[in-house]
Curated annotation (Swiss-Prot):
The lineage of its organism: Viruses, Duplodnaviria, Heunggongvirae, Uroviricota, Caudoviricetes. It comes from Enterobacteria phage T4 (Bacteriophage T4). Induction: Expressed in the late phase of the viral replicative cycle. Belongs to the T4likevirus baseplate wedge protein gp6 family. GO terms for biological process: viral tail assembly. Baseplate protein that is located next to the tail tube (inner baseplate). Involved in the tail assembly. The gp25-(gp6)2-gp7 module is involved in sheath contraction. This is Baseplate wedge protein gp6. InterPro entries: Gp6-like_N (IPR049026), Gp6_C-I (IPR049027), gp6_C-II (IPR049028), Gp6_C-III (IPR054065), Gp6_II_1st (IPR049029), GP6_T4 (IPR034698). Homodimer; each gp6 molecule in the ring interacts with its two neighbors, forming an N-terminal dimer with one and a C-terminal dimer with the other. Heterotrimer with gp7; gp6 is part of a (gp6)2-gp7 heterotrimeric molecule. The (gp6)2-gp7 heterotrimeric molecule further interacts with gp25 and gp53; the gp25-(gp6)2-gp7 module is involved in sheath contraction. It comes from the Viruses.
Length: 660
């Protein structure tokens, strides 16, 4: 009984195999091995260091270390959550039905003004017509752009043509091969844009089915698939259906799902765009760089829609990074190739349009059943183009449920107007003040990109200032005052739900920017002797709250007689608001709505004072308010953004040099 193991478990003896695999280095493993050998009778008092057996111990230790490292790496690289190599994460994601994004071409739409020497009724601008454009803030090394499709333009009465072309950055590459079912089809070009691929089999175009469900493909469907190889190249492959003829009916059949396989020795042509990716974002200054017979390009309009937020070519992107693949690859499997939940919509949009979408959130509205509202912010600018919206909507049609209609909308943007004061040591600044200001703006932009420009995220003034302090070693300290800004598209009347900041604001702090009012009166211009309309600036402001937390929304100042008064329309006589200083004695303010401070809701309707929208020469106004806290929160599809290129008025920087 004395030798019976406790609880009938084996106990370690002197000659038992040691736990030498616990060691993580060569020295530890070798030491554990020697200690184990010293415990055996054959090697008692044996000098391992001075013997030839030391070489064998080295060999065993190295072998154990290699096995340990390879085994550890193999286990880690087998799972998406623990893999370190991008190739391992990519292969695991593709097993879940997620194709990682390749480089994507920057795109834009332009309108040409052309003439034709033959004066034909219409002309055709073929796919692949070349143009050149320069990236933002550069005038060297222009980027190639090509038209994505054939465009037909009809001659107008002035014998001119105005084709609108969709351009993609890069060059069209055409590869032709003879199909061999034993040889993989691989494109060895890491600059390929997988969304701009066309594949032809014996002259007939086949359809890319990579992101679609195999359930919807028949055995004779002419489709193909793509996947990323271990070394980052792109492989094309087909289904396993082999064509045959039904002897009784004479119909073409196949005996396998997933699509048809080309016949042996078929001619396969692959056309794709090889692009520079994100480097070409913001490209402007387009010029015609091709030669079309009898066609002359007179002018190129880079912004045919007159978009005030035009940013040039955008949508260019680099290959998807490993962490994004790791996250979306797992979620994509849960979607089961259909859009049902809000997360499903977010995942599909992020997967396919990740190169142009920075943030996306899907939500529903109980008052509008049957719609899935998808708020998306592009990486460049603030608003998606009409073409981009339609592309997203059309892409989702294959995955959303029939009773649900996806609606692509812009987020409810909240801007933070920042008045920044930065103190720096004059003797430590090695560059100019202009350079330092640029560094500060870059740091603020980085803070917004990393922490703020995410739905349901928050802005903290203190955290932004830590980024500013890290802009350069010469910065001693910084301080800032902030205001929240809503851009109101319809200044005349607020939506039925009102305007919200989703944060508490201070009394009488809500003020709009000034905008022009046409009084309808005429005055003679002494310089020209001609009559002109009398115009002056007014603005919308709020008053202090009353005992119930309700304040008034008023507009002014108007000149006497410019607003027709009656028993329901009378000037506001209180002094609990910030008046707009003016030099012509205007002092008439009128109530047009109210502000509920505790509930954070603002309403107004200028029609209450019998003025029409034509009286105001403005479309969009900026509505400023002071928050009660330095931490700003968002919810319900609202998004805090920083776009200094498009909205420079929301940032002022005061640099104060100090000699030390």
């Amino acid at each position: 009984m004395a030798n019976t193991p406790v609880n009938y478990q084996l106990t370690r003896t002197a000659n038992a195999i040691p736990e030498i695999f616990v060691g993580g280095t060569f020295a530890e493993i070798k030491q554990n091995l020697i200690e184990w050998l010293n415990g055996q009778n054959e090697f008692l008092d044996y000098d391992f260091e001075g013997s030839r057996l030391n070489v064998l111990c080295d060999l065993l230790a190295y072998n154990t270390l290699y096995i340990q490292q390879f085994g550890n790496a193999a286990v880690y690289e087998s799972f998406m959550r623990t893999a370190n190599l991008r190739s391992s994460v990519v292969q695991a994601a593709q097993d879940n039905g997620y194709l990682p994004t390749s480089k994507s071409a920057a795109q834009t739409e332009i309108m040409l003004t052309c003439t034709d020497a033959l004066n034909r009724n219409y002309i055709t601008i073929p796919r692949g017509t070349r143009f050149l454009a320069y990236a933002k803030d550069t005038s060297v090394n222009p980027y190639n752009f090509v038209s994505r499709e054939d465009v037909i333009a009809i001659r107008d009465k002035n014998n001119q043509y105005f084709p609108r072309l969709k351009l993609a950055q890069g060059r069209i590459v055409r590869t032709e091969i003879i199909y061999d079912k034993l040889t993989p089809i691989i494109i060895y070009d890491k600059n390929i844009d997988r969304n701009q691929v066309k594949l032809y089999v014996d002259g007939a175009e086949w359809i890319n089915w990579t992101r679609k469900s195999m359930v919807h493909a028949g055995s004779t469907s002419t489709i193909y698939y793509m996947r990323e190889t271990i070394d980052g190249n792109t492989e094309f492959y087909f289904g396993e259906g082999e064509i045959s003829v039904n002897a009784s009916e004479g119909a073409l059949t196949a005996n396998y799902i997933g699509g048809l396989k080309p016949t042996q020795n078929s001619t396969i042509v692959i056309e794709y765009i090889s692009t520079n990716g994100a480097d070409a974002n913001g490209a402007v200054g387009f010029s015609y760089a091709d030669t079309l017979t009898n066609i002359t390009v007179i002018n190129i309009n880079e912004n045919p829609n007159d978009d005030p937020d035009f940013v040039g070519a955008d949508g260019g992107g680099d290959p998807e990074d490993i962490e994004r693949i790791r996250e979306l690859g797992t979620i994509k499997r849960e979607t089961q190739q259909r859009c049902v939940t809000a997360t499903d919509y977010d995942t599909f949009v992020s997967e396919r349009f990740g190169s142009i979408i920075q943030a996306v959130q899907t939500f529903t509205d109980s008052t509008k059943p049957g719609y899935a509202f998808i708020a998306a912010k592009p990486k460049s600018g603030l608003y998606l183009t009409t073409v981009q919206r339609e592309d997203i909507k059309n892409y989702l049609k294959d995955y959303n449920l029939a009773p649900i209609t996806p609606s692509i909308i812009s987020p409810n943007y909240l801007f933070i107007k920042t008045n920044l004061k930065v103190t720096y040591a004059l003797n430590k600044l090695q560059e100019s003040e202009q350079w330092l200001e640029g560094q500060i703006i870059d740091k603020i932009d980085r803070y917004y990109t990393e922490d703020v420009e995410i739905f349901n995220s928050s802005f903290a003034k203190s955290k932004m200032l830590t980024y500013v302090d890290d802009a350069d070693h010469s910065v001693i300290g910084s301080s800032a005052t902030i205001q929240m800004v809503r851009e109101v598209q319809n200044f005349y009347k607020t939506p039925e739900a009102g305007i919200k900041y989703n944060n508490q604001i201070k009394d009488r702090s809500m003020e709009s920017n000034t905008f022009s009012f046409n009084s309808g009166r005429k005055v003679v211009n002494p310089d020209t002797g001609l009559e002109e309309d009398v115009l002056y600036d007014v603005r919308i402001v709020s008053t202090d709250r009353d005992s119930k937390g309700i304040g008034k929304v008023i507009i002014g100042p108007f000149a006497s007689g410019d607003v027709t008064e009656n028993e329901n329309i009378q000037p506001y006589t209180g002094n609990d608001f910030n008046k707009l200083a003016n030099s012509d004695g205007r002092d008439k303010y009128y109530v047009i709505g109210e502000i509920n401070y505790p509930a954070d809701v603002i309403y107004w309707n200028i029609a209450k004072i019998n003025l029409t929208s034509e009286k105001f020469e403005v479309q969009t106004i900026e509505l400023y308010s002071d928050p009660t806290d330095d931490v700003i929160f968002t919810r319900d599809g609202s998004l805090i953004v920083f776009e200094n290129d498009l909205r420079p008025q929301y940032l002022t920087i005061d640099l104060e040099p100090i000699s030390q």
